[in-house]
Amino acid sequence: EIGEGCRGVRVEGCRLYDLGAGGIKVGTQHVPRSEWEKVEFIEVASNRIERGGRVFHSAVGVWVGQARFVRVVANEIADLFYTGVSVGWTWGYGESFACCNLIEGNVIHDIGAGLLSDMGGVYTLGVQPGTAVRCNIIYNVSAYQYGGWGVYLDEGSSYIVVEGNVVYDTTHGGFHQHYGRWNIVRDNIFALGREANIVLSRGEEGQVALIFERNIVLSNGSPIFQGGYAQRYSMRNIVSDRNVYWDLTGRLTVCREQATGREYTLDEWRALGYDRLSIVDDPLFASVELRDFTLRDSSPALRLGFRRLCRNGQKG
């Protein structure tokens, strides 16, 4: 645990396994009120955290609460019953100390095991300007009843950049935003969400929830977008364009709203202003069967400006 007043701490090259609870805890649950309480400039790098939560099942691999300038990079986190990496600890739009945190280059897999609900490979909470979730490989996220998501931006998550990630084989979706504002989701690969692929649970009238651009979404019969308990896409509260969508079944469902029961055709979706420059086409992965999501040079996504930011698609 890296607690109150800690600065300049680095945890590197450790193996943490067979854990009753979580792996590494950074920061506190409360917003610091004095200089000596602040937790900042921490690095958690190149560690292996596995087989956790054996007593307290809801434990997290790396938990970052009210802390800033924290780097969680190049770790492998696996075989937990709950979230892999959690960042921020303010519910909704209230005061938050968490900002400028980087979650990059981690391999997070075999999370949830179908035991608990409402989790993510990477989970964020609250307003976090400057925070980025970048170039992570996340796969095999499985929830009990609901909420097995790859990247999960929970209540109030705002001003966060999610880019260059490869997320696949989740029970409920590669990306989920509960509610938040002005998040940027770009240059990611989201593949093979069982129930849905991209989920927004609660939109807000007159607020841009997220900008979704230059992503590749591969489905196998589930809708590309899903609206949750209080999201109506007719509110026009997201910006989505220059994406590539493909369904292995040949029957693409662009969007389904749980609140209204409505399904949108591509033409109806575009009539709302969404995805007018996006295309429905095979993204040309190296091998979906082998879960190698490396793009061939002839991929249509590259023509739309998709950026291969990282070593996309390989487990490493």
Positions of the model-derived regions?
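Surface-exposed loop/turn motifs in large extracellular/passenger domains
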Residues: 2-12, 29-46, 63-73, 90-102, ...
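Acidic, glycine- and Ser/Thr-rich low-complexity intrinsically disordered tracts
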Residues: 205-316
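Short glycine/acidic-rich loop motifs that flank beta-strands on beta-rich extracellular proteins
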Residues: 1, 20-26, 53-60, 81-87, ...
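Extended polysaccharide-engagement surfaces of secreted carbohydrate-active enzymes
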Residues: 139, 168, 183
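Active/binding-pocket-proximal capping segment
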Residues: 180-183, 188-193, 205, 262
